[in-house]
């Protein structure tokens, strides 16, 4: 009989968001007619920008002609899109990232997991706690951790607690780690990092020859001018960091699927003999073998994000969601909740009442207010006692949800 990958058996009972869906479905089936407002999963709700729709429609029509038809595209992405990304997202901020260092993909969730394909199994890995679950689960699936401990953590991972005491910023490890995942603006806490704090991480990584996997999926929501949008704004980052970006949240591409990963040409690892090995060719080889590229139509939609109309419409979407976050933050604070985040990220991170766990509060909001959020403990041990609410919803739903919560 075929042998399975037993690492999957180490995973917790269910991925966080399917578990939430399971509980919500159970509640709605038992309470027919309940109008549940979902502020849990960070999925967008507003329509795509017209600039993107028009560009994709034009591209689709092109595909219906012999002259305009496109088959397999380049695995790295079309050069015209990578040039726009390089110019608008990096060169404009003083980051010398070339189009050749950009790999277009169908999602940063996929890339942050798939990057492990080119990294060895013996690396010591650090993650923040709480953390986006994909970072942990993908390492478990590929056998890079030990067994599950009683507290829900995994042997072999170094957990860096982020909480009120350290302003939700992880402390630099005292010892060497090989790989560290950083996400800023942070999911789930909504916290940001300053250039000075990020420089400490870059210096640490270069000193220890470590690799930073930097998730910048929410950079477009940054409002403060002194908050870095890219790790490459920091001197020395190109020699120690890979950055993940996405069109999902800023341009509403969660159902369209387009993202990109930056791997600088100067970034290196080493083999078992201690010889330096460039990471760019390894990732390029991986993509050429396992990925057929993002469709021409979708990439044309992504290119339109950088048009003058596209920029205006994307900014309008971001302003809409950030106004939602402001409403949530202000309403919850007026009701006596301690609230973090929501200033440079589309998430608010609230402390739950002292007599409740995160899942207790989840059930409380679901049953008493018909509002769904995400229990902080689902993001890690240090998330216990907190709760995440997403600003990705309609203005009416956000306003109604806040009124329901404060009137419980």
From Swiss-Prot:
<comment type="subunit">
    <text>Homodimer.</text>
</comment>
<feature type="binding site">
    <location>
        <position position="15"/>
    </location>
    <ligand>
        <name>substrate</name>
    </ligand>
</feature>
<feature type="binding site">
    <location>
        <position position="187"/>
    </location>
    <ligand>
        <name>substrate</name>
    </ligand>
</feature>
<feature type="binding site">
    <location>
        <position position="292"/>
    </location>
    <ligand>
        <name>pyridoxal 5'-phosphate</name>
    </ligand>
</feature>
<protein>
    <recommendedName>
        <fullName>LL-diaminopimelate aminotransferase</fullName>
        <ecNumber>2.6.1.83</ecNumber>
    </recommendedName>
</protein>
<feature type="binding site">
    <location>
        <begin position="246"/>
        <end position="248"/>
    </location>
    <ligand>
        <name>pyridoxal 5'-phosphate</name>
    </ligand>
</feature>
<feature type="binding site">
    <location>
        <begin position="108"/>
        <end position="109"/>
    </location>
    <ligand>
        <name>pyridoxal 5'-phosphate</name>
    </ligand>
</feature>
<dbReference type="GO" id="GO:0033362">
    <property type="term" value="P:lysine biosynthetic process via diaminopimelate, diaminopimelate-aminotransferase pathway"/>
</dbReference>
<feature type="binding site">
    <location>
        <position position="388"/>
    </location>
    <ligand>
        <name>substrate</name>
    </ligand>
</feature>
<dbReference type="Pfam" id="PF00155">
    <property type="entry name" value="Aminotran_1_2"/>
</dbReference>
<dbReference type="GO" id="GO:0010285">
    <property type="term" value="F:L,L-diaminopimelate aminotransferase activity"/>
</dbReference>
<dbReference type="InterPro" id="IPR015422">
    <property type="entry name" value="PyrdxlP-dep_Trfase_small"/>
</dbReference>
<feature type="binding site">
    <location>
        <position position="292"/>
    </location>
    <ligand>
        <name>substrate</name>
    </ligand>
</feature>
<comment type="similarity">
    <text>Belongs to the class-I pyridoxal-phosphate-dependent aminotransferase family. LL-diaminopimelate aminotransferase subfamily.</text>
</comment>
<keyword id="KW-0663">Pyridoxal phosphate</keyword>
<feature type="binding site">
    <location>
        <position position="42"/>
    </location>
    <ligand>
        <name>substrate</name>
    </ligand>
</feature>
<feature type="binding site">
    <location>
        <position position="132"/>
    </location>
    <ligand>
        <name>pyridoxal 5'-phosphate</name>
    </ligand>
</feature>
<keyword id="KW-0032">Aminotransferase</keyword>
<dbReference type="InterPro" id="IPR015424">
    <property type="entry name" value="PyrdxlP-dep_Trfase"/>
</dbReference>
<comment type="function">
    <text>Involved in the synthesis of meso-diaminopimelate (m-DAP or DL-DAP), required for both lysine and peptidoglycan biosynthesis. Catalyzes the direct conversion of tetrahydrodipicolinate to LL-diaminopimelate.</text>
</comment>
<comment type="pathway">
    <text>Amino-acid biosynthesis; L-lysine biosynthesis via DAP pathway; LL-2,6-diaminopimelate from (S)-tetrahydrodipicolinate (aminotransferase route): step 1/1.</text>
</comment>
<keyword id="KW-0808">Transferase</keyword>
<feature type="binding site">
    <location>
        <position position="132"/>
    </location>
    <ligand>
        <name>substrate</name>
    </ligand>
</feature>
<dbReference type="InterPro" id="IPR015421">
    <property type="entry name" value="PyrdxlP-dep_Trfase_major"/>
</dbReference>
<feature type="modified residue" description="N6-(pyridoxal phosphate)lysine">
    <location>
        <position position="249"/>
    </location>
</feature>
<feature type="binding site">
    <location>
        <position position="109"/>
    </location>
    <ligand>
        <name>substrate</name>
    </ligand>
</feature>
<feature type="binding site">
    <location>
        <position position="72"/>
    </location>
    <ligand>
        <name>pyridoxal 5'-phosphate</name>
    </ligand>
</feature>
<dbReference type="GO" id="GO:0030170">
    <property type="term" value="F:pyridoxal phosphate binding"/>
</dbReference>
<dbReference type="InterPro" id="IPR019942">
    <property type="entry name" value="DapL/ALD1"/>
</dbReference>
<feature type="binding site">
    <location>
        <position position="257"/>
    </location>
    <ligand>
        <name>pyridoxal 5'-phosphate</name>
    </ligand>
</feature>
<feature type="binding site">
    <location>
        <position position="187"/>
    </location>
    <ligand>
        <name>pyridoxal 5'-phosphate</name>
    </ligand>
</feature>
<dbReference type="InterPro" id="IPR004839">
    <property type="entry name" value="Aminotransferase_I/II_large"/>
</dbReference>
<feature type="binding site">
    <location>
        <position position="218"/>
    </location>
    <ligand>
        <name>pyridoxal 5'-phosphate</name>
    </ligand>
</feature>
């Amino acid at each position: 009989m075929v042998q399975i990958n037993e690492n999957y058996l180490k995973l917790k009972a269910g991925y966080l968001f399917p578990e939430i869906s399971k509980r919500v479905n159970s509640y709605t089936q038992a309470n027919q007619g309940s109008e549940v407002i979902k502020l849990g999963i960070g999925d967008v709700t507003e329509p795509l920008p017209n600039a993107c729709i028009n560009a994709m429609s034009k591209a689709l029509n092109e595909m219906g002609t012999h002259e305009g038809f496109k088959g397999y595209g380049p695995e790295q992405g079309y050069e015209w899109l990578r040039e726009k990304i390089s110019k608008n997202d990096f060169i404009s901020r003083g980051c010398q990232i070339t189009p050749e260092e950009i790999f277009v993909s169908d999602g940063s969730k996929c890339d942050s997991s798939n990057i492990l394909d080119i990294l060895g199994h013996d690396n010591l890995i650090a993650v923040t706690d709480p953390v986006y679950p994909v970072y942990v689960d993908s390492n478990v699936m590929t056998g890079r951790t030990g067994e599950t401990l009683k507290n829900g953590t995994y042997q072999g991972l170094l957990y860096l607690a982020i909480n009120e005491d350290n302003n939700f910023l992880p402390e630099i490890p005292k010892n060497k780690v090989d790989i560290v995942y950083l996400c800023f603006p942070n999911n789930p806490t909504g916290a940001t990092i300053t250039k000075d704090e990020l420089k400490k991480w870059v210096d640490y990584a270069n000193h220890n020859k470590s690799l930073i996997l930097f998730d910048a999926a929410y950079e477009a929501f940054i409002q403060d001018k002194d908050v870095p949008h890219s790790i490459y704004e920091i001197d020395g980052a190109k020699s120690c960091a890979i950055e993940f970006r996405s069109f999902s949240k800023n341009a509403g591409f969660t159902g369209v699927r387009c993202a990109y990963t930056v791997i600088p040409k100067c970034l290196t690892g080493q083999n078992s003999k201690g010889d330096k090995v460039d990471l760019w060719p390894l990732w390029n080889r991986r993509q050429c073998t396992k990925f057929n590229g993002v469709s021409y139509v979708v990439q044309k939609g992504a290119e339109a994000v950088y048009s003058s109309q596209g920029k205006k419409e994307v900014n309008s979407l971001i302003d809409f969601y950030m106004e939602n976050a402001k409403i949530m933050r202000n309403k919850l604070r007026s009701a006596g909740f301690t609230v973090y985040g929501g200033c440079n990220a589309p998430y608010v991170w609230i402390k739950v009442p002292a007599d409740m766990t995160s899942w207790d509060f989840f059930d409380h909001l679901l049953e008493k207010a018909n509002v769904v959020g995400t229990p902080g403990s689902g993001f890690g041990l240090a998330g216990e006692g907190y709760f995440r609410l997403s600003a990705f919803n309609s203005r009416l739903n956000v306003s109604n949800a806040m009124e329901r919560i404060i009137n419980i």
